Design a protein with these regions (language model features):
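Short beta-strand and adjacent turn/loop elements
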Residues: 1-80
């Protein structure tokens, strides 16, 4: 029961409305981000609004870099 309450609290603080507002992610990108960067209960319970927002922004920068690397064409490193 305690674990369920903790998960609800994390979901309450780390929610799609807040993440969308800060990151401008939508749809599949938003869903993937929310799963990949979901914070722990310990972090969320100790973080104030500013710290949580900064966490989300920092993670969004990492996520955007990951997306760019995935979308970048594979470069051939051998010269002809």
């Amino acid at each position: 029961m305690e674990a369920e309450e903790q998960e609800k609290y994390v979901t309450y603080r780390f929610n799609k409305t807040l993440v969308r507002k800060l990151t401008h992610f939508e749809g599949d990108q938003l869903d993937k981000f929310m799963v990949r960067y979901r914070p722990t209960y310990e972090f969320v319970s100790q973080a104030d609004e500013v710290i949580l927002n900064q966490y989300i922004l920092n993670c969004s920068y990492k996520f955007k870099i990951e997306l760019l690397r995935q979308d970048a064409p594979k470069q051939n490193t051998t010269d002809n």
